[in-house]
Structure formats: structure tokens, C-alpha cells
């Protein structure tokens, strides 16, 4: 019959009835000796068979199964008693929890009892992972339990708790997080080093310019000229937030400061240059070198013009005194 059952099932056939279908259709027809459209639930003597033998006995079709259905007839443990015989050769089935009602259109049509298989003899049996749901016909939850008659059962093995998906490795997942954090730290360190290096380069450049142009009243014009022609490199700063501004704003502010520096003239510097000219009238090369290196704004007279005017005044003053 097993070969006929397996060969009659089409490929891909799966049997997953609901509790209402098990009780209201299959069990009801079994008790009333009515044939079903397809005999997919077999009859077995559950208490003469171990749970691991149910898989081969109740196999349906060619697909792998994780639950098995069968009819079983309950017998009394003692002829004059009311308890059901649930012992097997290697162990026993023990009821656990409360019975649950099976409903159809909000009406009770049956009850479900949950049993767990124990290896050995009571009360020292070892609990296994085999579980069975036993369904019986019953019209009310308060009706007395019938210890004899047909029941339909669904046997399965309890799933392993905290079962990981296939191929899941916790250490790989942890390593991934560690590597990600290390990569992030390395990138932050490299960016920080880059900005620090840029700031150091700019600072060294400023120090070099300051060392070549020590403060000197005679060298003020050349230092102003050099700082006006040299364009300092722009420092890169990490963009922390949009509120800190953009490079465009920085360039505009730099140009404004540069324009202010050219438009502003320190009159003390001009006085110093004039005093230097008067003190050294016979050494015009120094004055000519200093004044030529200075390039003021077009709105003010050039230093070369000032030198010519001063020289003319000196000659005019000397001409007023006759030679002795």
C-alpha cells in the first residue's frame, strides 16, 4: 500500500491541512465510515510503534516532510479503568498543557491534546524532541473526554531553539564589524594627518617669509611688496556641517582683506622713508632699490616721484647759499 500511496501522489504534492479540515473533514468521515476523495492519512497502531518509525510508515509522496499525519484508535490502559494506554516498547507519550478547542465558524467541533514522547519508563523517562497533536471530535469544551475511539494525529519534531540560518557564522559577523571600525579609524587618521600636514606647510612658509623679511623701517616696502605678490595656499578643512561656510566664502573674505591691505597706506612708513633719504643723500642706490621694490596703489604718488621732488628741494636749498 505504501508503494501505491507514493506512486499515486503527483510530483510537488504537499499535504498541509488546517486543524478545522483535519477534524471537520478527515476525522468526521473516518468515524462515520465515509471515504475521502483521496486517502492520504493512513491507520497505524501508535502504541505499538516508536515515533522514529512513523516517518517511514506515514511518508506521503516523494517530497521531504517535517510532519506526519495518521489515524489511531485509542485503547484503555486497564479494562475497567478510564485512562488511555499511551505506552510503547521503548517509552511513553505524556500529555502536557491544557486541551485546546478546534473551531469552525465560531463553533466547537473538536479538541486538541498535546503529548510529548519520553524514553524509558515513568517517572524516570528522558524527554525527547518528539511532539504529537491528538485531535478528537467533541461538540463542547465541557463535554467528558472519551478514552476510546478514533483520533487523527499530527507528529513532528520540536525545532532546535535559536537555530541559525544555513551558513551563518557569528565570528565572521563580529570580524566584519571590527574590520569596519578599523577602516573608519584609519580613514579618520589619514584625513587628520593630511590637514595637519597642510597647516604645518603653511606655517613653515609663513616662518620662511618672516625670516627673510625681518622688521626693518628701511625694508618695510619690500616686505609689503613680497606679501602682496605671493599667494598663500588654501588650507583644506573637513566639511563638518553646511553652517561652517564654503570655499567660495573663504576666497571672497581673503580677497576683501587683500584689497583693504593695498588701499590702506601707513603714513608712518612714508615718513620713515623720507627721513632715510635726508639722512643718506649721497647713497641713492639704497633708496632707489627700496623705492622701486615698493609698488603702491595708483591713487597715491609713487615713491620715485617723491624722491625727485625731495632732490629738487635740496638742490634749491643749497643754491641759496653762496660758496665761501
From Swiss-Prot:
Residues 232-244 have a biased composition (Low complexity). Residues 232-259 are annotated as: Disordered. Residues 9-158 form the NAC domain. Expressed in developing protoxylems in roots and shoots. Detected in root protoxylem poles and in vessels of protoxylems, outermost metaxylems, inner metaxylems, shoots and hypocotyls. Expressed in roots, hypocotyls, cotyledons and leaves. Accumulates in the xylem but not in interfascicular fibers or pith cells in inflorescence stems. Present in developing vessels of the secondary xylem in roots undergoing secondary growth. Keywords: Activator, Cell wall biogenesis/degradation, Developmental protein, DNA-binding, Nucleus, Plant defense, Transcription, Transcription regulation. Its main location: nucleus. Induction: By brassinosteroids (e.g. brassinolide BL), auxin (e.g. 2,4-dichlorphenoxyacetic acid 2,4-D) and cytokinin (e.g. kinetin), with a synergistic effect. Up-regulated in a feed-back loop by ASL20. Levels are monitored by proteasome-mediated degradation. Repressed by WEE1 upon replication stress to prevent premature tracheary element differentiation. Accumulates during infection by the soilborne fungal pathogen Verticillium longisporum, especially in tissues undergoing de novo xylem formation. Forms homodimer and heterodimers with other VND proteins (e.g. NAC037/VND1, NAC076/VND2 and NAC105/VND3) via their N-termini. Interacts with NAC083/VNI2. PANTHER family: OS04G0691300 PROTEIN, PROTEIN CUP-SHAPED COTYLEDON 2-RELATED. Transcription activator that binds to the secondary wall NAC binding element (SNBE), 5'-(T/A)NN(C/T)(T/C/G)TNNNNNNNA(A/C)GN(A/C/T)(A/T)-3', in the promoter of target genes (e.g. genes involved in secondary wall biosynthesis, cell wall modification such as xylan accumulation, and programmed cell death). Involved in xylem formation in roots and shoots, especially regulating protoxylem vessel differentiation by promoting immature xylem vessel-specific genes expression. The NAC domain includes a DNA binding domain and a dimerization domain. This is NAC domain-containing protein 30. It comes from Arabidopsis thaliana (Mouse-ear cress).
Amino acid at each position: 500500500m505504501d508503494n501505491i500511496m507514493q506512486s499515486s501522489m503527483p510530483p510537488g504534492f504537499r499535504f498541509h491541512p488546517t486543524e478545522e479540515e483535519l477534524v471537520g473533514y478527515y476525522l468526521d468521515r473516518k468515524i462515520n465510515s465515509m471515504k475521502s476523495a483521496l486517502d492520504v492519512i493512513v491507520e497505524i497502531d501508535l502504541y505499538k510503534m516508536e515515533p522514529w518509525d512513523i516517518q517511514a510508515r506515514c511518508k506521503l509522496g516523494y517530497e521531504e516532510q517535517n510532519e506526519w499525519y495518521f489515524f489511531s484508535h485509542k485503547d484503555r490502559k486497564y479494562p475497567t479503568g478510564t485512562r488511555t494506554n499511551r505506552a510503547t516498547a521503548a517509552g511513553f507519550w505524556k500529555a502536557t498543557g491544557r486541551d485546546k478547542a478546534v473551531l469552525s465558524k465560531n463553533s466547537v467541533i473538536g479538541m486538541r491534546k498535546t503529548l510529548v514522547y519520553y524514553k524509558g519508563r515513568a517517572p524516570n523517562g528522558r524527554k525527547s524532541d518528539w511532539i504529537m497533536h491528538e485531535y478528537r471530535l467533541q461538540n463542547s469544551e465541557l463535554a467528558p473526554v472519551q478514552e476510546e475511539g478514533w483520533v487523527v494525529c499530527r507528529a513532528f519534531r520540536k525545532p532546535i531553539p535559536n537555530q541559525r540560518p544555513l551558513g551563518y557564522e557569528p565570528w565572521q559577523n563580529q570580524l566584519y564589524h571590527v574590520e569596519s571600525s578599523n577602516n573608519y579609524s584609519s580613514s579618520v587618521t589619514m584625513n587628520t594627518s593630511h590637514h595637519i600636514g597642510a597647516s604645518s606647510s603653511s606655517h613653515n612658509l609663513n616662518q620662511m617669509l618672516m625670516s627673510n623679511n625681518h622688521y626693518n623701517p628701511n625694508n618695510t616696502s619690500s616686505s609689503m611688496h613680497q606679501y602682496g605678490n605671493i599667494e598663500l595656499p588654501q588650507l583644506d578643512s573637513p566639511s563638518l556641517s553646511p553652517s561652517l561656510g564654503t570655499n567660495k566664502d573663504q576666497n571672497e573674505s581673503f580677497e576683501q582683506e587683500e584689497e583693504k591691505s593695498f588701499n590702506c597706506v601707513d603714513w608712518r612708513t612714508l615718513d620713515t622713508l623720507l627721513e632715510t633719504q635726508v639722512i643718506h643723500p649721497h647713497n641713492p642706490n639704497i633708496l632707489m632699490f627700496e623705492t622701486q621694490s615698493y609698488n603702491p596703489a595708483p591713487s597715491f604718488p609713487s615713491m620715485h616721484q617723491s624722491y625727485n621732488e625731495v632732490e629738487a628741494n635740496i638742490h634749491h636749498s643749497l643754491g641759496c647759499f653762496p660758496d665761501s
